[in-house]
Every structure is written in C-alpha cells, then in structure tokens.
C-alpha cells in the first residue's frame, strides 16, 4: 500500500507516541503507524458499519503478525455468534482462542446486576477483565460495546465517573484498548462522554448512493499524532477490513526513460525511442469499433513475449470471449494465460462500487506482481 506523506521536523524519538500497528491494509498508513499504544481508542459508527470487525481484525492481526495476545470482551454477542459471523471471512478466531492467545469473554449483563445505586461501580468487571488479561499476558483489549455495558445507568454523574474510571483502569493495565460505540445524531456515542476522554476516535460510515453501498472511515481525533484527515473508502471482504488511502498517496515514484513496445512496430516508430514509456499511463480513446481492444491486446501480447507478466482487467468481456475475439487477429492470449504470464479478470462494473474495484486491483497487483496492466474499459467503471 502507499505511504502517508512525511512531516517536517518530527518530534525526538523519545517523545514520539508509541503505536500498536493494526495490520489492516491501508489503516496503518492513514494513522501513521496504528492505534496509540497503551491508550484507549473509540470506534464509532452506525449499525453494520464494521465496528466489531475492526476490533477483531486488530486482535487477530495482533496475534498473527505482532505476537501480541488479546482479550475480546463482548456485552452483546456470544462466542458462538461471533464465530458464525466470521465464518464467511478468512479469520479463524476459534483456533486462536483454542491456542490461548486470544481470550473471549461474553459478559451477560442482567438487569438485576446493573441497577441504579449510589454505590454502583465496575469492580466486578475489572476483576474479570484483569483475570482475562493476566491469564494470557494480553497486550490488546477490545470491549464491544460501551452502550451495552452502561445500559442500566441513567444517572449522568455516576455514568461519567464510571466511564472515566474504566478508561483510567485500562491505561493503568498498559494495554492498547479498543472500545466500540454506536454513533448518535449529535455525538459519537449514545452518552457523548467517551469521545472527550478517548485518545483516538475512528468513525465508520456506510452510505448508499445510486443504489451502491460505500463504506468510509475517518480519523476524528488522535492525541499526540499526525494522521490523515480525510474520509477514506474501505471495504469488507473475505480477508476482513481493508482501507484505501487514496488521498494519502504520495507522488514519489521514480521516473524512467525506458521504452516498451506497443506490440505494433509501425506504431513504435511514432514514439521517440520506440514505444510507450515504462511506468507511464497510456489512454487509448476512440468510438466503438476503432480498435481500442486490439491495441490493448497487441501491448498485452508484446509484454508476454518479453517474458513479463501482465494483468488484464476486463469490464466488458469474459476471459473466454476476449481470447476468442483476439485470436481472429492473430493474438494467442490463451497461450500466455496457460503459461502463467497473463491473468485475465472479468467483472461487471455495476456489481460493486468504485472502491471495491480499486481494492480488488490493489490485491491483484500484490498477487500477480505484473509488469504491465491493461484496463478495458475504464469508462464503464
């Protein structure tokens, strides 16, 4: 993924805020390293926005990528319900729980247990949470969700005191904590108190425009750290949650004078040095039937003949139809596909939003590692 732009005059290393990387594609770029280490982050959003999944991604990646055990404490869904929710994703939470590197705690908040009393406190919760943390040496904690935890308290004074005490207790345990909360009309949580004492606030949004769902993520607040300030698209697929830091992309890639053949010798002669410039973007424009696909096929064939892998994204034809049509003008694309030099991916553009198509492209680039990419046709995306 891309790197966030560097800031001038960074703070001395000893003074910089330590961070816990999430391992989520793109997210660590816009937060410049992840979530604040040893502090509390509030994840806010509406129903179905991805709050719980972001927390689970944070825990699972923490174990797999950074060897940091974690605790997931749910005040809503049971352990089996969470496992079922993750069944369609490549996130094997159950295996990590069995290995005792993630501790799952389902806290059932009976109304009789949470009553409005002058001496109400969270000592019972602290004891249970401390036992879970200490039993596996957890470095990361997720509480899902804070509305359910404090649902039985209506006294504002008690509520404010207990929320502050919870956040202070988590910091004292020196764990990196994530707390989820439902976004309300004029605040990031139902109570509107957590946002003031959270060190970091992440807002998730899921909106529908022109019958296409689009997910957005934004860093609202991050004490002691620079961060991307824009809204960034993100998607949820079988790999979990992935962020596309489009507006954080830096223009720092190197230039080159190297040329590559168009696949048509007479066309190469029209370019100074012969052919397209390596690393450049070439737009082939024209009305229907003017040969746009043929020019793209010529370039694809030439790239494969040089032994360079090529990725062909088709939004109009299936792989079989493309191969058949191009064989009529002597381009044997099937040969290159069988040799593993050419990967053709066809998708109907109306099935997904632009963000999903872009993320798919990111992942295909990482998988195929092509030297050449052909997109046919960008106008229908």
Could you say what each language-model-derived stretch is?
Residues 2-18, 126-127, 131-136, 206-261, ...:
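Conserved P-loop NTPase
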Residues 2-84, 88, 247-330:
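The Walker A/P-loop phosphate-binding site
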Residues 38, 66-69, 100, 174-175, ...:
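Short glycine-/polar-rich loops that comprise or flank the Walker A/P-loop
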Residues 45, 106-108, 145, 221-223, ...:
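Flexible glycine-/small-residue-rich
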Residues 66-151, 308-381:
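Conserved inter-motif catalytic segment of the P-loop NTP-binding fold
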Residues 129-132, 152-153, 158-183, 288:
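Substrate-engagement module of ASCE P-loop NTPases
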Residues 149-160, 188-191, 295, 381:
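Conserved ATPase-coupling elements of RecA-like P-loop NTPase cores
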Residues 169-171, 175-237:
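Phosphate-binding/switch region of NTP-binding enzymes
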């Amino acid at each position: 993924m891309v790197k966030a732009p560097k800031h001038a005059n960074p703070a001395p290393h000893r003074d910089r805020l330590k961070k816990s990387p999430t391992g989520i594609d793109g997210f660590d770029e816009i937060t410049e390293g992840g979530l604040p280490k040893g502090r509390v982050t509030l994840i806010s959003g509406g129903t179905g926005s991805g709050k719980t999944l972001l927390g689970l991604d944070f825990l699972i990646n923490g174990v797999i990528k950074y060897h940091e055990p974690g605790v997931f404490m749910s005040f809503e869904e049971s352990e089996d319900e969470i496992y079922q929710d993750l069944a369609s994703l490549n996130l094997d939470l159950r295996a990590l729980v069995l290995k005792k590197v993630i501790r799952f705690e389902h806290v059932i908040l009976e109304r009789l247990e949470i009553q409005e009393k002058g001496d109400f406190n969270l000592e019972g919760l602290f004891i249970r949470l401390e036992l879970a943390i200490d039993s596996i040496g957890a470095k990361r904690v997720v509480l899902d969700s804070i509305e359910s935890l404090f649902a039985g308290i209506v006294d504002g004074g008690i509520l404010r005191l207990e929320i502050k005490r919870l956040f202070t207790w988590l910091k004292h345990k020196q764990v990196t904590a994530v707390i989820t909360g439902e976004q309300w009309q004029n605040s990031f949580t139902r109570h509107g108190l957590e946002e003031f004492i959270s060190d970091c606030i992440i807002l998730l949004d899921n909106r529908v425009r022109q019958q296409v769902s689009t997910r957005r993520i934004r860093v609202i607040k991050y004490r002691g750290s620079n961060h991307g300030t824009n809204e960034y698209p993100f998607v949820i697929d079988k790999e979990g949650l992935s962020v596309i830091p489009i507006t954080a992309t830096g223009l720092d890639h190197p230039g080159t004078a190297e040329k590559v053949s168009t696949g048509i010798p007479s066309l190469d002669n029209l370019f100074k040095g012969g052919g397209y410039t390596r690393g450049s973007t070439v737009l082939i424009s024209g009305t229907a039937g003017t040969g746009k696909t043929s020019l793209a096929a010529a370039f694809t064939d030439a790239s494969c003949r040089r032994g360079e892998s090529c990725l062909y994204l088709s939004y109009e034809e299936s792989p079989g139809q493309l191969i058949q049509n191009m064989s009529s003008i002597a381009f044997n694309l099937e040969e290159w596909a069988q040799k593993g030099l050419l990967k053709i991916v066809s998708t109907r553009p109306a099935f997904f939003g632009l963000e999903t198509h872009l993320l798919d492209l990111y992942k295909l680039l990482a998988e195929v590692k092509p030297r050449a990419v052909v997109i046919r046709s960008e106008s229908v995306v």
